[in-house]
Amino acid sequence: MHGLYSLPITLGGEYVDPDNTTRTLVSPPVKDIHDLSVLDLDNVNMEKDTAARNAFDALCYMREEIGEEVNCTMNFTAPFTVASGIVGVEMFLIMLVREPEIASKIMDFVLEAQFKLAEYFLKDGFSVGTSDPIASNSVISPRQYRQFAMPYEIAFAKRISAYTGKPLGIHICGQTRKILKDVADAGFVSFSMDNMVDLAEAKELVGDRMYLLGNVDPVGVMYQKTPEEVSEAVKNCYHKAWDSPMGFAIHNGCDLPAGVPKENILAYMETAKICATDMAKAEPEHIWDY
């Protein structure tokens, strides 16, 4: 993953780099929204963006070691979320109301910058997906999503698809129930949902239009519960969505925090293998029904 705010950091944003988590943006590169001079595509490249370079090296290593078994994919954050890091999240949300033209100008730049970086990975044969955490209805309204976030998700996806000939999947954090149909309308082939979304309801609303992924709670279950409780959570996800018309795969609701017990990860994987085997049989009785 490229990181939510790797581009703002590359453009001069101040950050901290803790030992136990990813880099955290603490001050955006743009201090005055009427001065966007730092938004220069000449400063967007693999040499200056250490996060992109490190991710590329890691993907190359993964492909060499396990590339015959799994697909190695890079995730680039969508323009809406990245733009929020250019000026700061609070200021960006204010701009959606008071300065929408400037907000759009920033997202235009981010669209070009993110695709410029993505091309390095595409040219080397890696798949590219996207995510848009700040586009969550836990942060913005469905109307704002449709007006500001969705058009740039579509634009970025079209750029990638034009290169690969394949549609993209997307992840959006938080509550997304009210925009499920919008995400499907955007043309995404798959949708990774956070644990706030009910998989059974998502299946009924858009299961015939998108491949669904989800959505074991990464903190409340994976980090805080026992292996037995993790196993039950995995089974519950399968129980709700195993027969989704366009397909289903188990997934965490979002990124796992540092320090998740190894036993919980193993319980997740082992239970998922059993459930996926049952799912493939497509028989009326499954392990999650007991």
Residue ranges and their predicted role:
Residues G3-N20:
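Glycine-rich loop at the start of a catalytic domain that most often binds anionic cofactors/ligands
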Residues M1-L4, N75:
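Acidic/polar N-terminal loop/beta-strand segments that form early-domain functional surfaces
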Residues G3-L4, V26-V38:
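A short glycine/small-residue-enriched secondary-structure motif
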Residues Y15-K31, D42-Y290:
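Active-site loop segments of alpha/beta catalytic cores
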